[in-house]
Amino acid sequence: MSFPAMRNGVATFLMGAGLALGSGQTAHAQDSVTVKQFDDGGIYEGTFRNGRQHGTGTYRLPNGYEYTGDWIDGEIQGEGTARFPNGSIYSGQFLRGQPEGEGRIIFADGSQYEGDWVDGKITGQGVATYVDGSMYQGGFINAQKHGKGVLQRANGFVYDGDWLGGLEDGVAAITYPDGSIYEGTMSR
């Protein structure tokens, strides 16, 4: 199983949105809520320091993207929530405009992931739940199952073992819906 196509779009979209903003009219208020429109049609409503977004604020783009949360010196950093035009919602930590650290994304189809993010990508330990009732808990690299992990399907199938590039690969224990168990090595 894999995530919907949006899984790789998070980092690309965030970077493409120009979230470290510096153009537009100069804000004069410091630490007070100000509304500022940018050349790309984006609107920021929040606090500024030294003419840059700093503190908390909301940034909206004409395409439906919206970020609400922390800003440091014109960049999205800290805790926040990003809502994407396709209906996906990410809440968690950001660094340099990208998900970084702990975060949760709920995809438009209802599947979700909660766990570690690195450079805007699902990487590290986490839990993914899928619309078919399956759940995976374990390691990820670039949104693919990797390392140790447990996949449980709604029908009772359980794979507990090694993963490589999203595929079962290595030592594992498999419990089938009928209760039979296989322990051994899986290979591509």
Which residues does each predicted region cover?
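Bacterial N-terminal signal peptides
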Residues: 11-22
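N-terminal segments that cap or nucleate solenoid repeat domains
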Residues: 27-66
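Bacterial N-terminal signal peptides that target proteins for export
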Residues: 1-13
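Intrinsic low-complexity tandem-repeat regions in disordered proteins
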Residues: 104, 110, 127, 133, ...
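Conserved anchor residues at repeat-unit boundaries in beta-strand-based tandem repeats, strongest
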Residues: 43-54, 66-77, 89-100, 113-122, ...
